[in-house]
Amino acid sequence: MKYFVVLVVLALILAIAVGPSDAVFIDILDKMENAIHKAAQAGIGIAKPIENMILPKLTK
């Protein structure tokens, strides 16, 4: 979650500093944030089945 906050702050600083005409930087940051988010989702998707195989079911 920290990376998202950092990217939001950077996006706001750049939006204020460069103005709306140079919003390319904002688009790049948005694409980076989306890529990081998708990578995290993929990592969780891979780790969850492995975790379920390794850890015994404690509720049964």
From Swiss-Prot:
KW Secreted (keyword) present: yes
Signal peptide bounds: 1-23
Coiled-coil blocks: none
GO CC, one annotated term: extracellular region
Keyword Signal attributed: yes
Name of the protein described by the UniProt record: Andropin
Similarity comment: Belongs to the andropin family.
InterPro entries, sorted: Cecropin
Consequence when changing G45N: In strain: New Caledonia
Induction or repression: In response to mating.
GO biological process assignments: defense response to Gram-positive bacterium; innate immune response; male-specific antibacterial humoral response
Role played: Male-specific peptide with moderate activity against Gram-positive bacteria.
Entries under Pfam families matching the protein: Cecropin
Highest taxon of the lineage: Eukaryota
Effect of L58S: In strain: New Caledonia
Tissue-by-tissue expression: Ejaculatory duct of adult males.
UniProt keyword list: Antibiotic, Antimicrobial, Immunity, Innate immunity, Secreted, Signal
Localization: Secreted
